[in-house]
Design a protein with these regions (language model features):
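Bacterial N-terminal signal peptides that target proteins for export
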Residues: 2-12
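Bacterial N-terminal signal peptides
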Residues: 11-21
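Predominantly soluble domains enriched in secretory-pathway, periplasmic, or organellar proteins
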Residues: 22-369
Length: 369
């Protein structure tokens, strides 16, 4: 089918958002680039497992700091940043050699994660123990700034223009707005009780914040940083993800064992979908047709059709499935099973488990390069 292309005019902010979205998509959806490698943070054995997607085998096991929880891949795919909760370190690995090039001390804490700024020059790491964000120069591994934020920060999201970052603090009930040019807090926004997860809409207009203690989602206008609405959802909302087109946001409610579908045009919950026990993480297929939800308490995945707003399949996996990532080509989902010390591999065409790959103890964070 021939498609007619029409010229459109877009402003510099839109261009920045498109480029930022593209770089983020390539970092997290690398299937179109050819080789795919899965990285798993093994919290209980202080290692990172490297899995080759084609062979479905562990090709390397890398010793890192104590209690690794998350792995983040730089936009140029040259580095992996491993946040280690117990040793409070960030370990930086050169890829694909898997050599340790730097260890940044006192940089993170439990639940801490690293994200990369626009262009990939700097990484920003949350430190829940010290209530601050550590700024690291990616190429050198040098710590360049420490930004004090609210009490108990774990998540962080970068604005589409690369100029700001947003950090919810669970005990302060606020979201800190960071000026990344100056590495200071520009303002703080009230965001319900125990704000936990944050996500920015595809068009860059809205910031959503889950209030794990107030059972709602705070909608913040990005341009003004004003609270537009608080949307009631289920109990203990802990995870947020936008669909590819940005028309819907999906919220995992860990306390009520369901998923809320929010229509962004009306900013209302359009459907509430029951899932398994204690939903933990979710990822969408590249087409956006299905969302896969890990259920820690029932040891399975709920597969939800975004078109019908219903569970179409429940897939058994290992014990206490925590994080999930879908490969960029949409062929496989990889699930970190913290209780059985392995990775479940799901064929997304058949929606059937095809492999269980043994890794280290208590695998948690998982990502694809």
């Amino acid at each position: 089918m021939t498609r007619i292309r029409r010229a459109v005019s877009i402003g510099p902010l839109a261009v920045a958002w498109l480029l930022f979205s593209l770089s983020s998509a390539l970092a997290h959806r690398p299937g179109a680039r050819g080789s795919q490698t899965v990285y798993v943070a093994n919290e209980g054995s202080d290692t990172v497992s490297v899995i080759d997607v084609e062979s479905m085998k562990v090709t390397a096991t890398i010793p890192v700091g104590a209690g690794p929880q998350h792995v983040a891949i730089s936009p140029d795919r040259s580095y992996a940043f491993v946040t280690c909760a117990r040793s409070k370190e960030v370990w930086i690995l050169a890829l694909p050699a898997h050599t340790v090039v730097a260890v940044v001390p006192d940089a993170t804490g439990p639940g801490g994660q690293a994200v990369f700024g626009y262009g990939g020059t700097y990484a920003y790491v949350t430190n829940s123990l010290e209530s601050r964000v550590t700024v690291i120069e990616v190429a050198t591994g040098r710590r360049v700034a420490l930004i004090p934020v609210g009490d108990l920060p774990t998540k962080i999201e970068i604005a589409p223009d690369g100029g700001h970052a947003y950090v919810p603090s669970e005990r302060s009930n606020t979201v800190a707005v960071l000026n990344l040019s100056l590495n200071v807090v520009a303002s703080e926004i009230p965001a319900g009780v125990r704000p936990y997860a944050v996500a920015i809409s595809t068009d860059g207009k809205y910031l959503l914040v889950s209030g794990a203690g107030s059972n709602n989602i705070t909608v913040i206008e990005m341009g003004t940083h004003k609270v537009m609405r608080r949307i009631p959802v289920g109990d203990d909302p802990h995870h947020l993800v936008f669909g590819p087109g940005g028309s819907f946001a999906y919220v995992l409610n860990r306390g009520s064992n369901n998923l809320s579908m929010i229509q962004m045009a009306s900013r209302q919950v359009m459907a509430t979908v029951p899932v398994g026990k204690e939903p933990s993480d979710a990822d969408l297929t590249p087409s956006g047709r299905y969302i896969y939800v890990t259920n820690i308490g029932s040891n399975d995945l709920s597969v939800i059709s975004t078109q019908t707003s219903a569970v179409v399949r429940t897939i058994p996996v290992g014990t206490r499935p925590h994080d999930i990532v879908i490969s960029g080509d949409g062929r496989y989902a990889f699930v970190a099973n913290t209780g059985s010390d392995d990775i479940s591999v799901i064929n997304l065409l058949t929606q059937e488990p095809v492999s269980r790959i043994p890794v280290g103890r208590r695998p948690r964070g998982i990502t694809v390069r």
